[in-house]
Amino acid sequence: MIGELYEHALAGRARPEIEHTDGSRKPLPVDGWLRESPGDKSILDRCEGPTLDIGSGPGRLTVALSERGIPALGIDITPYAVDLARSSGALVMLRDVFDRVPGTGRWTTALLADGNIGIGGDPAALLRRVAELLAPQGRALVELEPPGSPLRREQVRLCHAGSASAWFPWAYVGADHITDVAYDAGLGQVDIWTVDGRWFASIGGCQVCAERTLVTLLPNAYRPARG
């Protein structure tokens, strides 16, 4: 999908940008994936029980969970990222989230950090898949775009020095859209918080079959996390 340019970025040999179909570009934030980032502690503190780190990349969060004594498995589709994570001591598999995943139906927490709610370009479909992976009372922890950001489903690619990857589907979900996305996926209550300029949601993994669970997205619902 993103292949060689992504691997070069992880190895420090390139600084690719994400290009959108309208021609706009922004830097690929690879530095934050290679080391602890502000706000990581907040989402790690909410991981309970066996945790699946989806799109684990070079494995910083998978390693951090293991160091806390939390059983954690990372999955990623990029061989070099998997190798990096394993070299740091993480338990990681080369696996697509939509393929067969060990422990299906038994994970207590599923982690979609660093914008990985965008995987596949269809956030509701991704959350439906996550619900299959979770235990009945499990939860998904998801990183979001700030409030006011649109819900976008589009094609993007990586570009650097005249080279470009193939286009691939991706999505961006603003904090004030995640309740609707979770509802479309048939999931439960959404709790949103912010810390260190990052936005997150905890989403109940149990399927809702009748009444919609609403979270009022008013300014006082966006509360800074402590610690």
Annotate each language-model stretch with its function.
Residues M1-R46:
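S-adenosyl-L-methionine
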Residues T78:
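Conserved SAM/SAH-binding beta-strand->alpha-helix loop
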Residues G89-D99:
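Conserved SAM-binding strand-loop segment of SAM-dependent methyltransferases
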Residues F98-T109:
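A short acidic, Gly/Pro-enriched loop at the edge of an enzyme's catalytic core
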Residues W107-P123:
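A short SAM/SAH-binding and catalytic strip from SAM-dependent methyltransferases
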Residues A124-P136:
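A short glycine-rich, Lys/Arg-flanked "PGG" loop and its adjoining helix->strand segment in the class I
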Residues Q137-E145:
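Conserved beta-strand signature within the Rossmann-like core of class I S-adenosyl-L-methionine
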Residues F168-G186:
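Short alpha-helix
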